[in-house]
A protein has these predicted regions:
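Short amphipathic alpha-helix that is part of the acyltransferase structural core
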Residues: 2-59
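A short, internal acetyl-CoA/4′-phosphopantetheine-binding micro-motif in the GNAT/acyltransferase core
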Residues: 97-108, 137
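A short acidic/small-residue loop/turn micro-motif
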Residues: 87-89
Length: 171
C-alpha cells in the first residue's frame, strides 16, 4: 500500500468544536464522528459504541472534568483520520489519554504516525508524562493475547492496532 504521508499532500489541523452539529464549522467534527463510528464497527465487529453527532458534540463541549481536543489529518478537504485527546482537569494530572481513528480504507499508510506525533507534541507542551490509549478489537479474535501494562484486559497480539502500538513504544 502507498504511504499517503509521503505521496500525497496531507495536513494535520486542530478540530474545531462547533456550537451545533449543523454549524458552518462542523464539517471536520462530523467527519471525525463518522470515522469513529466506522472504526468501532470495523474493529469491534458491532455498532453498540455508535454515537450520534449531537451526543458526541455534547461530550466534547462539556469541559468540566476533562479537557478534550482533537486533530484531524486531511488530504485536501477529505478527512482521513483523527485523534481525540482527553486530559483530566485535576491539578495533579500527569496523563493524556487518546483515541486514534483512521478511516479503515486509509489505514497503514503513515497517517497513524502523523496523528500520534500530535499526541506526543501535546503531551510535551502540557508537561504530561504518561500517554495512554484504548483499543477496540473483536471479542472472538483468535491467537495469543498480550496483557497491557495497565492490567486492563488483554489485546490480540496479531491485531494491527496492537502491532502499531508496540512499534510506537507502548507497553
Amino acid at each position: 500500500m502507498t504511504d499517503l504521508a509521503e505521496t500525497d499532500v496531507v495536513t494535520v489541523q486542530r478540530i474545531v468544536v462547533p456550537e451545533t452539529a449543523d454549524a458552518a464549522d462542523a464539517r471536520v467534527f462530523l467527519e471525525m464522528v463518522r470515522i469513529a463510528n466506522a472504526v468501532c464497527l470495523e474493529d469491534a465487529g458491532h455498532d453498540y459504541l455508535h454515537e450520534e453527532p449531537d451526543e458526541m458534540l455534547g461530550f466534547w463541549q462539556d469541559q468540566t472534568d476533562w479537557t478534550q481536543l482533537g486533530f484531524a489529518v486531511l488530504r485536501a478537504d477529505e478527512v482521513l483520520g483523527a485523534v481525540k485527546l482527553m486530559i483530566s482537569n485535576e491539578s495533579d494530572a500527569s496523563t493524556i489519554e487518546f483515541d486514534l481513528m483512521v478511516d479503515p480504507p486509509h489505514r497503514g499508510r503513515g497517517l497513524e504516525e502523523l496523528l500520534l506525533a500530535e499526541v506526543e507534541r501535546e503531551a510535551r507542551e502540557r508537561g504530561l508524562a504518561t500517554i495512554q490509549t484504548w483499543t477496540l478489537h473483536r471479542p472472538d479474535a483468535a491467537g495469543p493475547r498480550l496483557q497491557p501494562s495497565t492490567g486492563w484486559g488483554a489485546v490480540p497480539a496479531d491485531d494491527a492496532q496492537t502491532k502499531f502500538q508496540l512499534a510506537s513504544g507502548f507497553t
